[in-house]
Amino acid sequence: MFTGLVRTMGRLQRWRSGVWVRGDLEALGPLALGDSIAVDGVCLTVSRLVGDGFQADVSEETLARTTLAPKADGGGWVNLEPALRLSDRLGGHLVSGHVDGQGEILGIQRQPASWRLEVGCNPQQQGRYLCEKASIALDGISLTLAGCDNDGSRFWIAVIPQTWITTTLQYRQVGDLLNLEIDLFAKYTERLLYAHGQAGRPQSSGPKPGPEGGSSPSQPISAAWLRTQGW
C-alpha cells in the first residue's frame, strides 16, 4: 500500500522479463529483495539489487495495462515511492499500486499559482467513479480532481508547483499517457452496492457473482436514487 506522495524519480529501462530502475534512490531508504516499490503508480517487487538501482519482474498483464513498456523502451523518467509503513503519516490517500487503466493528457495550462492538467479517460472503466474533489492517482501521484465532465470522459487537476517540480509531470506533454488508479473507496462502494442489488454491475474482467454474490441490480446509481437513500 502507498500514499501517492512521490519520494524521488528514476530512469526506467528494459531488463529481461522486467524493468531496471536506475538513479539516486537514497530517498527510498534501504532496499531489500522482496520490497514493494511504486514505479509510476505500479506496485513492483524488487527481485534484484544493483549498484545504481533495482530490477523487477513485470507480468504481461501489467505491461498491457500500464505505460511501463514504452517508458522502459525510451529510458523515461518514473515516479518512485516505497511501501507505506503503519507508523507513517498518510499525507496523500490510500493507493494500492494496481493501475485501473490509462488516461491521455489533453491539455496543460500554466496558471498564476498552479498548472491545470486536463486528462481524458474511458467513461465506463474509470470515468464512472469520478467526481469533483475526489482523489485519484496519476502515475503514482496523489491528486485531487478540480472538476470533471458529467459523462466522466474528461477531468482536470490543479497541480501546485511543489508537486510539479518533484514529479515526472514536469516532463509530460499533451498526448502522453498516464497510469490511472481510481480511489479505492469508490470501487469498493460500487461493489457493495451491486451485491445488494442497488447498482449496475461493476466494470471488471473477473468472474461474475454467483447466486450468493448478490441479486440483479434494480437500477443504476443516479442523483435521484441517492436522494431516496438519504444522500
Language-model regions, residue ranges each:
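Conserved loop->alpha-helix
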Residues: M1-W231
